[in-house]
Swiss-Prot record:
Quaternary structure annotation from Swiss-Prot or TrEMBL: Interacts directly with MAPK1 (wild-type and kinase-deficient forms). Interacts directly (in GTP-bound form) with MAP2K1 (wild-type and kinase-deficient forms).
Native organism: Mus musculus (Mouse)
Residues annotated as binding GTP: 23-30, 71-75, 134-137
A Pfam family assignment: Ras
Gene Ontology biological process terms from the UniProt entry: positive regulation of ERK1 and ERK2 cascade
Domain of life: Eukaryota
Family: Belongs to the small GTPase superfamily. Rab family.
Domain J, first and last residues per copy: 217-273
Chain positions covered by the region annotation Required for interaction with MAPK1: 1-18
PANTHER family: RAB FAMILY, RAS-RELATED PROTEIN RAB-7A
The name this protein goes by in its record: DnaJ homolog subfamily C member 27
């Protein structure tokens, strides 16, 4: 009598991926990687010279992932060294220090450098990016709040995590989500799955929130010229209110931006006869 023995499910093939770190010097790129791979924090700062390379293995679902990590020096001096390592990358860890505004402002420059080195045929849409707002343990010195960092990341369809290499906060969760997204990319034919969060608000809303956040006065906040009439102020306010009202806009920082617009309108109308 024959019995039907169920076939054993063959394990999924191992996957080899390439990951690079990007960001200014001293933002904690190497410390984040060491915290995850070696479960330790190195308090003494040792600048990365050119490129640090490491290999680690992780398990994602039922699949073994062999990760080649290229930790790139952030100092401009090492551009000629790191520019060879952008190609054939599946994942990017983009790091800034929440206490250094310059490191946050430099994120766009890092993306521009990568785009330039990939050349006209390079496609950054097929790479998983995760933004690490690092050193959140230094809360007293923080100058880039979570909503500003999250807005920048999500407006580009990037993952975003608050991290501390010193305490380990957010590190494991970040890497797990990061690797899972890369596996999804590879299983999706090399195309990055659309991040649901990036579709929840428009570029216009994101750009407007940034403009309001960086405005020097109430006139600039509403986008009207100094000395504008009451009608012009109200018209500008209504347009912004429709765009940013918390009931309609879910972009990070929208509620604060809306309140700022309300206060700006009130302040201007007090001085307009």
């Amino acid at each position: 009598m024959e019995t039907n023995v169920p076939k054993r499910k063959e394990p999924a093939k191992s996957l080899r991926i390439k990951v690079i770190s990007m960001g200014n010097a001293e933002v904690g790129k190497s410390c984040i990687i060491k915290r995850y791979c070696e479960k330790r924090f190195v308090s003494k700062y040792l600048a990365t010279i050119g490129i640090d390379y490491g290999v680690t293995k992780v398990q994602v679902r039922d699949r073994e992932i062999k990760v080649n990590i290229f930790d790139m020096a952030g100092h401009p001096f090492f551009f000629e060294v790191r520019n060879e390592f952008y190609k054939d990358t599946q994942g990017v860890i983009l790091v800034y220090d929440v206490g250094q505004k310059d490191s946050f402002d430099a994120l766009d420059s890092w993306l521009a450098e990568m785009k330039q080195e990939l050349g006209p045929h390079g496609n950054m849409d097929n790479i998983v990016f995760v933004v690490c707002a690092n050193k959140i343990d230094c809360s007293k010195h923080r100058c880039i709040d979570e909503s500003e960092g999250r807005l920048w990341a999500e407006s580009k369809g990037f993952l975003y995590f608050e991290t501390s290499a010193q305490t380990g906060e957010g590190i494991n969760e970040m890497f797990q989500t990061f690797y899972l997204s890369i596996v999804d990319l590879c299983e999706n034919g090399g195309k990055r799955p659309t991040a649901s969060s990036s579709a929840s608000f428009t570029k216009e809303q994101a750009d407007t929130i940034r403009r309001i956040r960086n405005s020097k006065d109430s006139w600039e906040m509403l986008g009207v010229r100094p000395g504008a009439s009451r009608e012009e102020v109200n018209k500008a306010y209504r347009k912004l209110a429709v765009l940013l009202h918390p009931d309609k806009c879910v972009a990070p920082g929208s509620e604060d931006a809306f309140k700022a617009v309300v206060n700006a309108r009130t302040a201007l109308l007090k001085n307009i006869k």
